[in-house]
Amino acid sequence: MTENISNEKPRLVNAGQGFSILNTVNYKGRFLYSKYSPDKAVVAAVSRLQVLPQTLVVICSPCLWYGLNELCALLPESCSIIALEADDALLELAEDSLLDQTQKLRVKLFSLNEPQKINEYLLQNTSSGNFKRAIRIDFSAGVSFS
């Protein structure tokens, strides 16, 4: 049983709430979003953010990127977004789910298994004083697998 869970791939499950076309993710025996309103919690968390100019926003476990449009809409132009994923299967899901070209230009997605790439990006962008602060936001329950 444990071996089956460790080899499991993330599975998209229709939330099935009215006319909603949103999915949730079932992975390693748990849902990473609500089964009924998958985007509700992360959109609410984003709406509560107070983001100042020159902030680096760190998205943890982006999975299906619910909340990204809302986040991009509230960010000052001087802010940047990076997304981090520790689990390889969830990283692949996040890469496949980030379809919008505008979003791809705004967000840099990194695997936590490649710290040198994260370090290079941060050194390149912090040395010129681009960021004065950072905030973290968890986009899914996938953070529990890191």
Sequence positions of predicted segments:
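N-terminal donor/sugar-recognition subdomains of glycan-related enzymes
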Residues: 1-146
